[in-house]
């Protein structure tokens, strides 16, 4: 049949559902598997698994009629293996095993897809645990021997002989659990089983009230003993639901165990628990605060090692952490001082006769990186004839051909300083006539009258702004900014190939072709006779 299968009216569906429910109370494993797989595949394709889609897909894949699929789906809903969800007036279905666990309790019980291959009786027995209601069923309550009140009573009445056996494994578990602080969200996931987790604190507390005695190995549990007895009286439904087997610890229990208010003031989030865990670890010296306020593992500490003594350890590691932080700060301050000295010594005076033009350009534009804002302001403010004296970097007497470079010209994008010698900048000895000066990347110092020199005839010596000016004069002002953003100076321009212009500059293809052709014409006019015109400029 070409169209989608005609679904029966609700009355017929209800009758079919009740008849099927009367005949067999549990859905057959085949149908359960088919329906759950269909729901999962629809959700994975972001399609809403409503009744019509589920019936159509089950029929296409496996062949049963929509009425039968509906009946089986109703059974699965009764078994709580499938959840019916109403969203914006339309009803869809979800696989209960993939739904997030309820927020208040621990993780949900075993997923309901387990009885897939099991007989119908096992499937029928599965329903009660899944909804996770606060009042637990009687058999589950009976099967939970580790309930908090019973544990407290047992701890109060128990003789001290079984006591030492309990804290041993717990201490071994708790030490690695508290030791690696970078994963504070781990306690809920890596939780020990419910029995030994809840029972020992009162037993240990009742057995050894004084904290100091060193022979006791479990240092972390002892330090945290006073808070745990508080949560014992009010048992939560979540504590009972797990049936006494391994139950992950809820965030609320972790907060109470660390002595915080158990989420009384608003929602309990992982962030709050993480903050409590970090504070606890920092207070006990397992973490140290950096200068920026973050928490980091002390350098000497390894996560696996247990602390030697309970009382001596926190104060010692706290002191050690402060000393380490102080040492770090001193080292960083020393490094900064050295960097500043290097900046001044490198940028102060440049013997021009010893350096080629490229080296002059890179001396301040290269590896040193942008300078601090204070230094930039100092270097920008002076202009006019007193520039060298105001900067405090005037030439030494008898310095021969040394020349003072103004640091005023700053490249707008990069923020790095480039060497500039305008006609304003004083030079004790006049420049050699044949040596062209490098114009500043931006032209003139801020607030100073424009006194740029003309663009050098040799493009090797062009700066970024010379290249921008060249293309602006050629009639491509918008595209010239692309050359400025990429910081293409004369040398880079000479090395560019055709593909670099067309694809590497984020210029649209039409203008890029025009720019390239304009430049080829310039080449043909004999601007650069010696260069090979295959490249962009050579």
Swiss-Prot record:
SUPFAM superfamilies for this protein: SAM/Pointed domain
Residue ranges with Basic and acidic residues bias: 282-291
The protein, known as: Sterile alpha motif domain-containing protein 1
Residues that bear Phosphoserine: 161, 261
Domain notes: Winged-helix (WH) domain directly recognizes and binds unmethylated CpG-containing DNA via simultaneous interactions with both the major and the minor groove of DNA.
Extent of Acidic residues compositional bias: 328-351
Annotated ranges, domain SAM: 462-530
GO CC term (a single one): chromosome
């Amino acid at each position: 049949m070409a169209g989608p299968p005609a679904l029966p009216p609700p009355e017929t569906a209800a009758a079919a559902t009740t008849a099927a429910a009367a005949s067999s109370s549990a859905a057959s494993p085949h149908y359960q598997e088919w329906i759950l797989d269909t729901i999962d595949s629809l959700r994975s394709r972001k399609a809403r698994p409503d009744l019509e889609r589920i019936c159509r897909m089950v029929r296409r894949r496996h062949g049963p009629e929509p009425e039968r699929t509906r009946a089986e789906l109703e059974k699965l809903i009764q078994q709580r293996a499938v959840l019916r969800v109403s969203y914006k007036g339309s009803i869809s279905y979800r696989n209960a095993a993939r739904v997030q666990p309820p927020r208040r309790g621990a993780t949900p019980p075993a997923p309901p897809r387990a009885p897939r291959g099991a007989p119908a009786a096992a499937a029928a027995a599965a329903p009660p645990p899944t909804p996770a209601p606060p009042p637990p069923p009687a058999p589950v309550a009976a099967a939970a021997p580790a309930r908090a009140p019973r544990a407290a009573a047992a701890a109060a009445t128990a003789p001290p002989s079984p006591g030492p056996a309990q804290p041993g494994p717990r201490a071994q578990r708790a030490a690695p659990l508290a030791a690696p602080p970078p994963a504070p969200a781990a306690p809920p996931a890596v939780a020990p089983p419910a029995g030994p987790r809840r029972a020992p604190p009162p037993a240990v507390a009742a057995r050894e009230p004084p904290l100091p005695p060193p022979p006791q190995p479990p240092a972390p549990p002892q330090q945290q003993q006073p808070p745990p007895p508080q949560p014992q009286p009010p048992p939560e439904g979540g504590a009972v639901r797990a049936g006494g087997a391994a139950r992950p610890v809820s965030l609320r229990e972790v907060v109470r165990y660390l002595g915080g208010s158990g989420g009384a003031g608003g929602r309990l989030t992982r962030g709050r628990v993480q903050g409590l865990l970090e504070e606890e670890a920092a207070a006990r010296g397992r973490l140290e605060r950096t200068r920026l306020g973050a928490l980091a593992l002390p350098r000497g500490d390894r996560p696996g090692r247990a602390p030697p003594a309970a009382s001596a350890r926190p104060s010692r590691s706290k002191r050690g952490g402060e000393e380490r932080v102080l040492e770090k700060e001193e080292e960083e301050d020393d490094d900064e001082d050295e960097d500043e000295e290097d900046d001044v010594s490198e940028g102060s005076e440049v013997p021009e006769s010893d350096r080629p033009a490229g080296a002059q350009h890179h001396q301040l534009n290269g590896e040193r990186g942008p300078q601090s804002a204070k230094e930039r302001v100092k270097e920008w403010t002076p202009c006019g004839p007193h520039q060298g004296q105001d900067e405090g970097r005037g030439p030494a007497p008898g310095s021969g051909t040394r020349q003072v470079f103004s640091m005023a010209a700053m490249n707008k994008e990069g923020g790095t300083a480039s060497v500039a010698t305008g006609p304003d900048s004083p030079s004790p000895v006049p420049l050699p006539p044949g040596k062209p000066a490098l114009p500043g990347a931006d032209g003139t110092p801020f607030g100073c009258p424009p006194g740029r020199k003309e663009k050098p005839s040799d493009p090797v010596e062009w700066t970024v702004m010379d290249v921008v000016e060249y293309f602006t004069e050629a009639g491509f002002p918008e595209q010239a900014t692309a050359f400025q953003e990429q910081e293409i100076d004369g040398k880079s321009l000479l090395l560019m190939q055709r593909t670099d212009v067309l694809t590497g500059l984020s210029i649209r293809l039409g203008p890029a072709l025009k720019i390239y052709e304009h430049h080829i014409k310039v080449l043909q006019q004999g601007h650069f006779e010696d260069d090979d015109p295959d490249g962009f400029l050579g």
